[in-house]
Regions:
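Alpha-helical scaffold segments that mediate packing/assembly in large oligomeric complexes
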Residues: 98, 103-110, 117-180, 229
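Structured alpha-helical segments in the cores of large, soluble enzyme domains
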Residues: 75-85, 170-185
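Assembly/oligomerization interface modules of large self-assembling protein complexes
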Residues: 24-89
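Short, charged/polar micro-motifs that form catalytic or ligand-binding hotspots
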Residues: 47, 79, 83, 98-112, ...
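Glycine-rich, often proline-containing surface loops adjacent to acidic residues and nearby aromatics
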Residues: 86-101, 152-154, 190-195
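N-terminal alpha-helical "arm" segments
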Residues: 1-29
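Surface-exposed acidic, glycine-flexible loop patches that form ligand/cofactor-binding
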Residues: 136, 184-189
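Sequence/fold signature of self-assembling virion shell proteins
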Residues: 2-9, 147-180, 190-195, 201-308
Length: 308
């Protein structure tokens, strides 16, 4: 016997089918990054409402010692604590019972697809805010902008920021900066650039620089080392450009040891309230997830405003 409870389950199943097909489907061209792109935002799961991270200064290089000499002691240090609170993101839409019952899929399915799009857009907008605001108000644990000059725990400073527009020469400057970056103990890390992240307006130029067989923007026939040796992956997002409050000229390099993190407390979940509990014969379909994003340390990252 077909029951009302079964009917309710069918309604939620139909809504979830449309929602998650849209939310999980990536119909963009290759190279478009999202909050779920692990090369850019390292996923970390938590069971708490907040995440506390701190920056560590290691021991530094080993000194040479004599045969029976006392082994020198180096004391690691932890400081610059930063707390990231998990945010809850939620939204709901009303769907008329009659609209659903009459099987007017062209209407309610479009509403649910848009609902899924906005869930993904919210994730991406929030995540790439670390880069949009990386020269100003998005801070590392030391209280400085992500892309700026940082005071090292062991003394001295390290800059991971530039101002020059993206060219083969400036890209090399960024690559060298990553390779020669000093860690908190003042030791050169030797990080290798893996990701080049740009706004859509700079995507074509970035691909020409990194993918051309010969050096881009040049009349000579030298081999393009960015393609033949380095293997940079170029990523873009429409949440980086001026249209989204960012910059069309800014560009970023990331190494494997970068600190951009996606903190996940709860993945996307949906819920449906039956029309019987409304006063206007409507279903209420809701979705929510809990997460946040942070970058605690400058290491493994380089950014240029591209304004010079």
């Amino acid at each position: 016997m077909f029951t009302e409870a079964q009917n309710f389950s069918i309604v939620q199943t139909e809504l979830d089918k449309v929602f998650f097909q849209r939310f999980d489907y990536d119909d963009t061209f290759p190279g478009v990054a999202h909050a779920t792109t692990a090369e850019i935002f390292k996923p970390v799961e938590t069971t708490h409402a907040a995440w506390i991270q701190s920056i560590n200064k290691g021991s530094g290089l080993f000194p040479a010692v004599g045969e029976t000499a006392t082994v020198p002691l180096s004391t690691p240090k932890v400081t610059n604590k930063q707390t990231t609170l998990v945010n809850t993101y939620a939204q709901g839409i009303d769907i008329s019972k009659q609209l659903f019952d009459d099987n007017m899929h062209g209407v309610w399915e479009n509403d649910v697809r848009d609902f899924a799009d906005q869930a993904k857009n919210t994730q991406d907008f929030t995540a790439f805010g670390l880069f949009r605001l990386g020269f100003t108000t998005a801070l590392t644990a030391d209280g400085q902008a992500i892309f700026s000059t940082h005071t090292l725990i062991g003394g001295g400073t390290q800059s991971n920021a530039g101002t020059v527009a993206l060219t083969p020469t400036s890209l090399n400057t960024g690559i060298v900066n990553l390779m020669e970056q000093k860690n908190q103990a003042g030791v050169i890390s030797g990080a290798t650039a893996k990701v080049l992240l740009v706004a859509p307006a700079n995507w074509k130029h970035a691909r020409e620089i990194t993918d051309s067989a010969l050096i881009a923007d040049s009349g000579n026939n030298n081999v393009n080392v960015y393609r033949s040796a380095l293997g940079l992956t170029v990523w873009t997002s429409h949440w980086l450009g001026a249209a989204a409050g960012g910059s069309d000229t800014a560009w970023f390099l990331l190494a494997a040891n970068h600190g951009f993190t996606r903190l996940i407390r709860q993945g996307l979940e949906t819920a449906l309230t039956d029309w019987r509990y409304s006063n206007n014969l409507t279903y209420r379909y809701q979705a929510n997830y809990r997460e946040n994003y942070f970058c605690a340390d400058y290491a493994g990252s380089y950014g240029s405003t591209g304004t010079a």
